[in-house]
């Protein structure tokens, strides 16, 4: 029954779909309090891809490898990066700590996810804001690279 209701909501219109996902991610962020869960993708493995990770990052090696693969398609060093759909912030944190951009901003529709990120991360070149991927609150050319992995 619940599944049927959700499917009806998702099929009504793009705005009802957006409303549902915003609510869903807020509920998830409020209730999934385990701050060890920083990434929500399935991960990536490729022979020869060997990242030297800090011990605390090893538990999420494969999801981090997906971010590494995607982000390294461009030279991110000293660039301003925007991650759209930053979720729990693990990808933006990885990029900020390992790939040496000038800055990383994570934007997510879930205010609860952004509040969680603000509590978890204290990295000088990393910040998070609430925002909508369909109406990004920055002027054109504010960022050098846009990354979207988990949405």
Segments predicted by a language model, with ranges:
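N-terminal auxiliary segments of SAM/dcSAM-dependent transferases
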Residues: 1-38
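Conserved alpha-helix/loop element of class I SAM-dependent methyltransferases that forms part
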Residues: 60-77
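Conserved class I S-adenosyl-L-methionine
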Residues: 79-87
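Conserved SAM-binding loop of SAM-dependent methyltransferases across substrates and taxa
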Residues: 88-100
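Conserved SAM/SAH-binding beta-strand->alpha-helix loop
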Residues: 110
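Conserved SAM-binding loop
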Residues: 117-118
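A short acidic, Gly/Pro-enriched loop at the edge of an enzyme's catalytic core
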Residues: 134-145
